[in-house]
Design a protein with these regions (language model features):
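Conserved catalytic-core motifs of GNAT/GCN5-like acyltransferases
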Residues: 134-136, 154-172
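Proline- and acidic/polar-enriched loop/turn elements at helix boundaries
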Residues: 46, 119, 136-137, 160
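Residue-level marker for beta-strand->alpha-helix junctions and adjacent short loops that shape enzyme
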Residues: 92, 140-142, 160
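GNAT-family acyltransferases
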Residues: 1-106, 123, 127, 166-182
Length: 182
């Protein structure tokens, strides 16, 4: 299992967007929509400025086999950042990862999330060699729950007080998709 840049990036599967490597120069646009109250409500991000994202870029730039991978979801027309998607908690030993994604509200409700999640999950199984891809989703994030279910993820459990979210314990659903179950 390797993701050291040798594997071609997945195709988005959606006419509105394409995928490319996330770059440090994307931080202001990424922060702009992550700070939107409609996005904040359903995520565990606790950002004060675009500078708070910089440590993430250090991890994404690492060539280590367990380093997180994050791709930019960009509009085909104009190239503006519309979201990000990738893998965290990568275990080369167990061939597992956790998928994470976020989209700007401007592209919600257009099938973008379902398309890019399917594309990146298939890439994770076929190109990166994962056997299991899981997702944790805040219980109130009904849109993301529907995306995961449309993408053949199965609900595996309920994680009480799983993460602190802006000073409060948050409950999450655990979903997973297994390579053999595709």
């Amino acid at each position: 299992m390797s993701h050291s840049g040798k594997s071609p990036l997945p195709l988005s599967g959606h006419p509105l967007v394409t995928l490319r490597q996330l770059e440090r120069s994307d931080a202001p646009a990424w922060y702009a929509y992550l700070a939107d109250p409609a996005v904040v409500e359903h995520t565990s991000w606790a950002l004060r400025s675009a500078d708070d994202l910089q440590a993430n870029f250090d991890d994404y730039a690492s060539a280590g086999p367990a380093s997180s991978i994050r791709l930019a979801v960009v509009l085909r027309d104009g190239g503006q950042l519309a979201g990000t998607i990738g893998f965290n908690a990568i275990s080369p030993q167990h061939r597992t990862a956790e998928i994470a994604y976020d989209l700007a509200p401007a592209v919600w409700g257009q099938g973008v999330a379902t398309s890019v999640v399917n594309a990146v999950v298939d890439w994770g199984f076929q190109r990166l060699g994962f056997l299991r891809i899981q997702a944790t989703v805040l219980e109130s994030n009904e849109r993301s729950i529907r995306v995961l279910e449309r993408c053949a993820f199965e609900r595996e459990g309920y994680l009480r007080c799983y993460r602190q979210i802006r000073g409060r314990s948050g409950n999450f659903w655990l979903y997973a998709r297994i390579a053999a179950a595709r």
